[in-house]
């Protein structure tokens, strides 16, 4: 698949209750740059010709103003009444003609290993054996290295990065464009896709590092990834 036919959706509308005073989490500085700029730099390196769609919500104007002009920005004005699925759905509307969609949550700090092994020929999820907190969603992986189910209280963790194409992309659109799913989490939609016959390869190796920034302690841990 040509990279020109790939869209990267970065859902970044949520408040982040424990870090609200920091403003939009993608603008938190980690190392010499912000979370979102670190993400974009890596994504532009490894998926150079893709289209990037940033979905804003909490303090949307500030986030839009402090991110590069070459990315597309849309606003989930109902961010405080809905969940990430509505933001993903809005990103999909802006990516209508793409053959593949990568989703990267907007509060992640990760290294190049987290994205450079993604194949654009098959839907997949990135597994994080290091970095993600115990409270994050874990994975049940089948003997064929395909994802069976996502649920809490399991290891290894889903790294909140996924790629969708073919049947899985069509199911993602159908589910995210259904209003009754607006309050769902992303992992619930992935489970729904699997239940409807979709399949996700699991990308995992011990060099992948991903941290979901949920506290000030996570910021210090994230700096070590970028060293």
Give the residues covered by each predicted segment.
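N-terminal nucleotide-binding beta1-loop-alpha1 segment
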Residues: 1-21
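Conserved N-terminal catalytic core of the sugar/cofactor nucleotidyltransferase
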Residues: 1-7, 33-100, 179-181
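Conserved alpha/beta core of the MobA/IspD/sugar-nucleotide pyrophosphorylase nucleotidyltransferase superfamily
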Residues: 2-6, 157-227
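Short alpha-helical oligomerization interface
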Residues: 22-26
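Conserved beta-loop-beta/alpha segment of the NTase-like Rossmann-fold superfamily
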Residues: 63-138, 142-143
């Amino acid at each position: 698949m040509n990279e020109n036919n790939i869209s990267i959706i970065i859902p970044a509308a949520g408040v982040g209750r424990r870090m609200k005073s920091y403003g939009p989490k993608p603008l938190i500085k980690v190392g010499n740059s912000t979370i979102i700029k670190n993400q974009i730099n890596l994504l532009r390196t490894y998926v150079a010709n893709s289209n990037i769609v940033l979905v804003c919500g909490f303090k949307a104007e500030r986030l839009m103003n402090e991110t590069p002009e070459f990315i597309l920005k849309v606003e989930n004005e109902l961010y405080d009444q809905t969940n990430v699925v509505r933001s993903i759905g809005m990103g999909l509307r802006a990516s209508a003609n793409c053959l593949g969609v990568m989703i990267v949550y907007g509060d992640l700090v990760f290294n190049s290993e987290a994205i450079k092994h993604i194949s654009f020929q098959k839907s997949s999820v990135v597994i994080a054996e290091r970095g993600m907190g115990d409270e994050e969603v874990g994975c049940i992986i089948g003997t064929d290295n395909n994802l069976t189910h996502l649920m809490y209280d399991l290891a290894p963790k889903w790294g909140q990065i996924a790629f969708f194409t073919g049947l899985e992309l069509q199911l993602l659109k159908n589910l995210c464009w259904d209003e009754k799913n607006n309050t769902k989490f992303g992992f619930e939609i992935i489970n729904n896709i699997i239940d409807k016959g979709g399949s996700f390869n699991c990308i995992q190796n011990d060099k992948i590092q991903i941290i979901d920034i949920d506290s000030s302690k996570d910021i210090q841990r994230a700096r070590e990834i970028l060293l």
